[in-house]
Amino acid sequence: IGLMLPYTPLHHVLLSDLTHTQNCMEKKKALPALVMTSGNMSSEPIALGNREAMERLSDIADIFLYHNRDILVRTDDSVLRVNPTSGDPLFMRRARGFTPEPVFLADKGPVVLGVGPELKCTVTLTKGDQAFPSQHIGNVANLETMEFHQELLAHMEKTLQVKPELIVRDLHPDYMTSERAETLGSERSIPVAILQHHYAHIHAVLAENQFTDPAIGFALDGTGLGEDGTIWGGECLLVIPEDLSHQRLAHFSHIPLPGGEAAVREPWRIAQAALREIGITSPGTYRWPWLDEFSRESAFLPKILEKRINTPLTSSCGRLFDAVAALCGLANTITYEGQAAIRLEKIQDMTETHAYPCPLMSHEPIALNTHELIRGVTEDLDAGVPVPIVARRFHLGLITGLVDMAYSFSLILDIHHVALSGGVMQNLTLATELPIALEQAGLVPLVHKKVPPNDACISLGQAAWGQRKLLLEHP
């Protein structure tokens, strides 16, 4: 259920016909249903004016309500969840009503621009001890959204009356934001620095909390190019803001992605690949849910995995959720990002207390053995355990494994603060129960409260890191 507050008188006019709601309730009639969507095509920015709306939206809209007040800046509606334990907001999208409110930093510094990632992109400019994350831009994968990116940056520079001394971009060279950063740096003769995706996540949550001491960071998301060329996403990182040193301490067990991007759209591929990693190549008593729909493709998958044809490895926490959801029969395929993980979160039997094992493997490189979570899920499904119980045991096992890993590194490094970031931290179970479990282990969690934990926070992490970099280079 989504709750929307009217922010213009126009909303009252549009909804005036619903004033009979009380009568409907009294007469036991069906209440009217409203479907809300923003004024844009998928993956494109919101239409800015009447003419643009007519050109871009006439195929999907039957009626246009014009207004004589021009829109100067595109701004989506903000989307939040509420942490039921703490009451704190958990941003999914930070835009209308919250931007351009600044995030206050620990120190004053020079002006830095963080151009953001490719998905859920924002840009951030720093000014003194303040960082200004922009409103939601979207997925920067087409010309229209890239133009909005440039348009918004120009607007922010004019509003704040600043020009960046450093531009920070993602490690991935093919992101349109990375290409734009290099072009902008060349045009303005500004240096461009590179910060890996998941370190940017951790620097974002540290900056938001004005925390400058060393911290252990969990960056849990879907994808990001790692320093070793593989796809990261289930990372335990050491970050030292004082001198900007960092280290990858551990990661989730690798899972192959047969078909690359196709595996993201079809989680059954990830599930079957994960099963093969633990030695399971055929169904047990539990029939794999995807066999009816994808029996032919499933038969070819072992050969693709064996020859590693278009099959990158990932340590992604998001892909782990996808695999488990597919195993549970919740999503063979998806039509929107996070669909499989959302279903897995929602179906949990919250009365269940048993957790699957998720041990830390001490060999180099150190890994959290998330393959054991897959094994636990498979064994329970074979034994006929209901999916809601399986889903809950998976969540509890992951939380237990993360806490054990954090505690182990805390003892080794004498560091007690644990920063939590990444799109998986939008999962309300992890967002509420993981910080509590860390506190019970004697650790101090640092979480997002002012910006989303998803990739929308990347530009903040880039900008805060870049500002510290300039301060170190020019004390």
What are these regions (language model features)?
Residues 1-168, 172-187:
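Active-site-adjacent structural elements in enzyme catalytic cores
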Residues 33-45, 172, 221-231, 308-331, ...:
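Conserved phosphate/anionic-ligand binding catalytic regions in large, soluble enzymes, centered on
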Residues 77-81, 121-126, 218, 234-238, ...:
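Short beta-strand scaffold segments in enzyme catalytic cores
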Residues 198-220, 224-226, 267-276, 395, ...:
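Glycine-rich phosphate-binding/hydrolytic loop that grips phosphoryl groups
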Residues 247-261, 285-286, 305-309, 443-449:
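Short beta-alpha connecting loops at secondary-structure transitions
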